[in-house]
Amino acid sequence: MSLSVKVCGITQKVDADFALQSGASRLGFILYEKSPRNIKLHEISNISKSLDIEPCNMVGVQVEPGIDALQEMINFGFGSIQLHFSYDFPVDILKEWSDVVGPDKLWLAPKLPPELGFPKSILPLAETFLIDAYTEDKFGGTGERSNWDGFYRWQREYNSKKWILAGGLSPNNIELAVNTTDARFVDVNSGVEKSPGVKDHAKITEFFTNIP
C-alpha cells in the first residue's frame, strides 16, 4: 500500500527541502496566530520559491478563519486548505467555507470529543477529512494520539471520502498506526521536531523508514 504523507508545521526552507526529499507528498504551513508554528504568507512565499514542489502540494492550515483570511489563503494559491474547528461550530459557516474554497480543495478537521461520533451533516461539504487528537483548549500540534478506532470506522463507513490520520504520529508509532487504522494518508508534525517549528531530520528519516 502506498501511503501519502503530509509534513506539517513547516517554518524553514531547509526542513521543507528535507521533508520532500524524504518522501513527503504534501507540506503544511500553519497560519493560525496562536500556534507556535505560525508562519506568514510572505514567509511561505520566500520558502516556496526555490522548492521543488507544485502549489497543489502545499497545504494552508487555519483555525476557524474569517472569510477575509480564507480569501487570502485562496489567493495565495494553496492546493488544499485545512480548516480546524470546534465540534459545535455553526454549520452555516462551514457551508460558506465550502462555497468559497470548493469541496475538492477543502480539508475539514473537526475537533471531536472522544465520546461523540462523526458529524454526518458536514460530509457533503468537503472531499477530505482530517482526524486529529482532541484537547479542550488546543487545535492540533499537541503530540497526543487521536481516535484511531473512530478513524478506522469512519474511513470504512464513508469510503467515498479521503481520510487523513493526524495526532501524535511519530517514528515510534507510525507502523502500528497504519496497521491499526488502515490509513492511506497521514499527517505528522510534532513527532518529527526538535522544537515547535524546527524539524528533526533524523526523526523524519526514521519516520519514513518505519512506514509499513
Regions found by a protein language model. Give the residues of each.
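Conserved N-terminal beta1-alpha1 strand-loop-helix module at the mouth
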Residues: 1-185, 190-212
